[in-house]
Amino acid sequence: MSQPLPPGWTEHKAPSGIPYYWNAELKKSTYQRPSFIEKNHSSSVTASQASLAFNTSEKLFVNENAEERKNSRDLRKQLPDRPKFKKRIPNNDSWVVVFTKKNRYFFHNLKSHESYWEPPLEISKDLKILRLPIRKQISKDSSQSQNVDSGKTNHEEIHESRHLQTEIEEPSGLEESSEESVLYSEEFYEKSDEEEDEEKSHSAEELEFGEEDIMYQLQQLDDETVSYDIQEQATNLSTDDARRVFTELLKDKNIGAYQPWELVYPKLLDDDRFYVLDSGERRKEVFEEYCKSVVSTKKITRRKNTLSDFWTLLHSLPSTLLWPQFKRKYRKSSTLQIPGYSERDFEKLFREFQILRKQPMQDKLLNFKKLCKSKTVDPKNPDEFTESILNDTRYAVLTREELDSLACSSN
């Protein structure tokens, strides 16, 4: 029978079933069962004894925390590995790279359901695009010398790697000769401090998938193959539709217009819309058209919006406001600091705006139609409005609702 817990400590169970202990007063938890601190049961306790008990309790708690951190690291290393995400291999419909939570990766065939640690020859040329994490090659002799202290021989390391591959694929697909000549340990560019500490202390240790983990992993891959139907549907798209879908991908990813294609396309490989176009040449062509469109749109927007803030400010003010009052209040406002416009220009625009805004809506719309006719612009198509129209008071006095009613009218 286990001893009762000290006052303030309660026992709980983690989702993994491992018990841990929590002290609400100290706001601390530990996997190590707390024990009673010996007390003097005499009626009188001296101050020195109380101080000694406190110091002992503090040291015990520090030791428990250190033990807890060690147990937590060991527990994480014992947890089964799981697939984290996968990447499609360019120019190949059958193979994907699967990355696991333990920072490992392998190659999986979606059609044959075979998996390999080493890339098959048919996809080796396409892997450079993915920029996979570096795998450090370790020779047989050096790996044997490293495993002397850890108690694990090179033969056992090879057996683990072979055992993992055997569980994840059909045995007929393995090439044993390559495994026996070279071992592979994976080294990533970005690692947390905790992971680096674990690697230093357990550099020769390899985690092994269990049968349950492999079944779960393959099930995950089977479930995710639905997303690849998009690529099959892409063959039914017309050329124009495919180009439109690819352009939408560039917009959704917020691709800048001044980035080179060589740096852009690796960011798009994970999206199925990248494959609606069947060649890199067509993708680059659509990308260049997209860049030209973005640049031209920015130039037009910059030109069109010269007085937009000024018109917005006037709409927010009462129609009875006079120029002297406006000038006194907004003289130093950034809204009136527009290159090419003097104070006299703003006064003229202000007075015209205040007069025209008091007219009936039909009169305002009629004046605007005459303005558009003089500029040979369709008043129902805002995309055609030029700078001269957008900076004219006959356009500025119209509200958004009035412009919408004009666009919806049949005349």
Curated annotation (Swiss-Prot):
Residue span(s) of domain WW: 3-36, 89-122
Record-annotated FF domain positions: 239-293
Basic and acidic residues: bias regions: 66-83, 152-166
Molecular-function GO term, any one: RNA binding
Biased amino acid composition, Polar residues: 140-151
Start and end residues of each stretch annotated as Disordered: 65-84, 138-209
Ranges of compositional bias, category Acidic residues: 167-179
One term under GO cellular component: nucleus
Pfam family, one: WW
Name under which the protein is recorded: Pre-mRNA-splicing factor dre4
